[in-house]
Amino acid sequence: MSVVVQHVEEKAVHSWSRISTAGKKALEEALLVFNPMSQDLSATEAQLVAFLQGLRDDGFQPTILRSGDVYGYSSCTANPPSQTKLQARAPNPTATSPPASAPRTAMRLPAGRATLLPMPLSGRLAKASTPALAKHATTNLLLSSLKQSSASHARGAAVGFPTHLYPGVYPAMRLSVVLEALVPLKTPMPCLGAKHKAQSLQLSLADSPLKLRKSSGKGPGNPRPKAPRKTTSKGPKCLTRKGPGAGPRRGSGHQSKTNRATGSPSVRRMKGGSALGTKTAQAKVARTLAKAARAQAKVARTQAKAAKARAKAKAAQVKAKAKAKAAQVKAKAKVMAAWAKAKAKAKAVRAKAKVARTQPRGRGRPKGSAKARTTRKGQKNRPETVGQKRKRAEEAKDLPPKKRTRLGPRSPKAWLGPGTAKLLKFRAIKVDRRSSDDEVRQRAQRILRVNLSPVIRLQPLLPYSAV
């Protein structure tokens, strides 16, 4: 059952835990008999009374509770019938009073609580439940309480389940409150407070069949504001409370006199039971809250520890990633430097090889020098005329001096060592007609102080200087 109230589920859990203490067999039987979604209300009510009788035969002390005690919603808002009408409709108490030997198994129940079913079902249920209980010779307590009132359907609905407050709740669900009857509630419920003004009915069990009678009460000047707990040798028993505005409680004085005469422990323990139960409940709630707070603190610490571990792992991962990236950049720079160095070295080797290929071989003279020398030798054999010499001199003056292309590099210091470069005082050896190969070689050796190098260039003298 699910109700909008927040604390309803907790109360349901407590009630189920109390049911399980009565034994597995009783729990299974209760589940089979009192299915909240049952459609057969007549059979369910008949089985309800039979089940209560069977529990009493087995030694249990079932206590019928209101739905508000179990599920949390308050049924005290219903308007109970007036006391005058109840007194007029109630049967003769002397005819329904049980023997005096059954005071220990007697239990008190509010009048509004006994009407667990709507009023329109009372007539059919009375006929259907009578043959089902013939074996136990038992009177249907629920129907007996309903027979006391012959009011209209509206009055019956007001006394019974508040259908206007919970329209979606099926009426048969109210029968499931009897599951709470195996073990009574440990603490009094607030819905049993001063709102309830109806007279309480006392259900007693003896060797004879179940009977319905009014409970005995004190005078009008002593209303009971709280519901104490009655403790017997078989277990605790929940007693209902009356509001401060309730009227006198009618019933047979024989029961109360018997209790006073026998000195039952319920009379002596009635005063401090409610306060003790309330303190116990408050202490239990405080312990539960403290335990929940400790659990929440433990969960928070665990979450903080996990978050710290995740942050630490993330920082270590970022640090490792940065370190790997720096190592990768360093390795890449190292590779690039080695590649550039190798490239420069290869380029220098290629340039050196190219220069070696372009330089002349042999005696170190340009190729055109031998031809010029042979030409000059041929001219020496044929003496020039005066007119030819004058003409060649004039042409030489008119023409600008020609720039001879250098076959080697511009600076011979690039191919010579620092010590050898200092010995080089001239860049070229000037020759004329009278210069021979031996003279040129000797001049070069004097300049370089080494063997002849291909860097030395031969430059012929101008024609006019040779005259």
From Swiss-Prot:
Compositional bias annotation for Polar residues: 253-265
Keyword DNA-binding: no
Protein name (record): Coiled-coil domain-containing protein 71
Modified residues (Phosphoserine): S129
Pfam short name (any one): CCDC71L
Protein's organism: Homo sapiens (Human)
Positions with biased composition (Basic and acidic residues): 392-401
Transmembrane segments: none
InterPro entries: Ccdc71/71L
